[in-house]
Amino acid sequence: MAEAFAGTWNLKDSKNFDEYMKALGVGFATRQVGGMTKPTTIIEVAGDTVTLKTQSTFKNTEISFKLGAEFDETTADDRKVKSLITIDGGKMVHVQKWDGKETTLVREVSGNALELTLTLGDVVSTRSYVKAE
C-alpha cells in the first residue's frame, strides 16, 4: 500500500504553514525561511521499509521506518519526537509525540498530486505537492 506514495514530489502550494510552525514553537527567523522554502519530498519503498527524504535549500532530512513500528525522529526544526506511521484508508498517517504534545501529518495521493495535511490542536495547514516527471 505504501507504494502508492513512492516518487518525487515538489511543493506547489502551501496554506497556513506559518501558523502551524508557530504552534510547533518554531522561532520567527526559522518560520520566515521555512515559509519561503519549496521542499522536494522523495518517498522510496523497499520491502517493508519506507524512506522519506525532504530536501530544500534550508535543510535536508531523511527518515527510514517500518509501517506500524514506533521510531525516534529528529524533525527539521530539531524536535526529538516519537513517531508512528501507518496506512489508514489509503492515507499515510504520521503521528509525532513530544513533551506531552502531538501533531499529525496525513499524506494522501490522488493521481499525480499529493496533499499533506498538518494538524496540531486546532491549527491545520495544507501543503500540495505535484509528482515530478
Curated annotation (Swiss-Prot):
- Location of the protein in the cell: Cytoplasm
Q: Which UniProt keywords apply?
A: Acetylation, Cytoplasm, Lipid-binding, Phosphoprotein, Transport
Q: Record's CDD domains? A: FABP3
Q: Which positions does UniProt annotate for hexadecanoate binding?
A: 127-129
Q: SUPFAM superfamilies, alphabetically?
A: Lipocalins
What are the recorded GO MF terms, alphabetically? lipid binding
Residues that the record marks as modified (N-acetylalanine) are 2
Quick one: a GO cellular component term?
cytoplasm
Provide the binding site for (9Z)-octadecenoate.
127-129
At which residues is Phosphotyrosine found? 20
Binding annotation for octadecanoate:
127-129
Q: Does the keyword tRNA-binding apply?
A: no
Q: In which broad location class does this protein mainly occur, judging by the first location in its UniProt entry? A: cytoplasm
Q: What does this protein do?
A: FABPs are thought to play a role in the intracellular transport of long-chain fatty acids and their acyl-CoA esters.
Q: Which PANTHER family match?
A: FATTY ACID BINDING PROTEIN
What's said on domains? Forms a beta-barrel structure that accommodates the hydrophobic ligand in its interior.
Which family does the record claim for this protein? Belongs to the calycin superfamily. Fatty-acid binding protein (FABP) family.
Q: What is the protein's name according to its record?
A: Fatty acid-binding protein, heart
Give the organism, scientific name: Oncorhynchus mykiss
